[in-house]
From Swiss-Prot:
Subunit structure: A double ring-shaped homohexamer of HslV is capped on each side by a ring-shaped HslU homohexamer. The assembly of the HslU/HslV complex is dependent on binding of ATP.
Protein name: ATP-dependent protease ATPase subunit HslU
Record's subcellular location: Cytoplasm
Gene Ontology MF term list: ATP binding; ATP hydrolysis activity; peptidase activity; proteasome-activating activity
Domain of life assignment: Bacteria
Function: ATPase subunit of a proteasome-like degradation complex; this subunit has chaperone activity. The binding of ATP and its subsequent hydrolysis by HslU are essential for unfolding of protein substrates subsequently hydrolyzed by HslV. HslU recognizes the N-terminal part of its protein substrates and unfolds these before they are guided to HslV for hydrolysis.
Pfam families listed in its UniProt record: AAA, AAA_2
Keywords: ATP-binding, Chaperone, Cytoplasm, Nucleotide-binding, Stress response
Organism: Rhizobium johnstonii (strain DSM 114642 / LMG 32736 / 3841)
CDD domains: RecA-like_HslU (cd19498)
One cellular component term from this protein's GO annotations in UniProt: HslUV protease complex
Amino acid sequence: MTTFSPREIVSELDRYIIGQHDAKRAVAIALRNRWRRQQLDPSLRDEVMPKNILMIGPTGVGKTEISRRLAKLAGAPFIKVEATKFTEVGYVGRDVEQIIRDLVEVGIGLVREKKRAEVQAKAHVSAEERVLDALVGTTASPATRENFRKKLRDGELDDKEIDIEVADAGSGMGGFEIPGMPGANIGVLNLSEMFGKAMGGRTKKVRTTVKASYSDLIRDESDKLIDNEVIQREAVRSTENDGIVFLDEIDKIAARDGGMGAGVSREGVQRDLLPLVEGTTVSTKYGPVKTDHILFIASGAFHVSKPSDLLPELQGRLPIRVELRPLNKDDFRRILTETEASLIRQYRALMETESLSLEFTDDAIDALADVAVHLNSSVENIGARRLQTVMERVLDDISYNAPDRGGTAVTIDAAYVREHVGDLAQNTDLSRFIL
């Protein structure tokens, strides 16, 4: 789990997301509180419940991006799910308990990687022996073996091809659910897993270079040194205490005034979410998982519905409300220039692969921001996503002709932007240009 302070978390999010300081602060404090709780006395630790967050704001202002960046920062089991993908228990589809099962799988992956790192040195030694076996055979004399070991460590044999046996992760025989059995998807029957255990772990022969073989062999040897029981126990503990669930599009399951039908099922999903957010025990194939201390961050645009359309009990379980504001021209300008992987930087890098140098003047960036603001206000406000539409339109000709213009430099100014997107800004009825 991350030990970043709230200020450091906000500063890290600032590298990718412009503005929305309130939302960043809320998630930073929530993340830090996870760490603070771990430092408490065990008797008090169980009493400290996470303060779940509801993020409200128009589309394209950074709600989902905050969750993506938070996942990388968290250093804890983190899963982002769309609320619209789940159905009420009793209907065909995935029920909300699957969220926790998926979260445990994420936890298993995290703990396994950590354990692999701990035994990597031992695994590397074993992997080297297996490479030598493949190169000189198991019956070679110690002198020959040492001679090849020296060459191997000096990198002289990196490109030599060898045959190695590695664990077969499964042949794509997926799992299936047993119809008509309640809770059947606790451990969706995974055929490859069952057969693998029955046959004592299958292996497959792979032909690869010496250099490329190391990653597979080290992973293979690491897994032999790791106790799966310990991994499962630690993953369940980590999920229960540090797990974070990001529920996107929660406004889509809010019951709207008037009209029944689909609304009944939407309300059913909310009812199913209640015990999960409040604290319940979910059965998984790794054992029962308590959700009392899992942090839930919900977000929605609430264009059609309002937060008050959610069930009152669910509203009560999301005590921290954060509003994200719509983006203005200055925000668009900063998104184009200041973020770590800004659109302008991406397009420059793409064109450099064709040996084409792309430059944007300051007034071109202003013009791009102007067009995006105008389209958002006159057509539909889709936030920062509008910039992708505008940029694609501006660079359409350049992208198409780039292979023929290699070795040249192109400077884009305000006049060029207006020439290529002027019609887009004026004829808002031309639906082919509107995202």
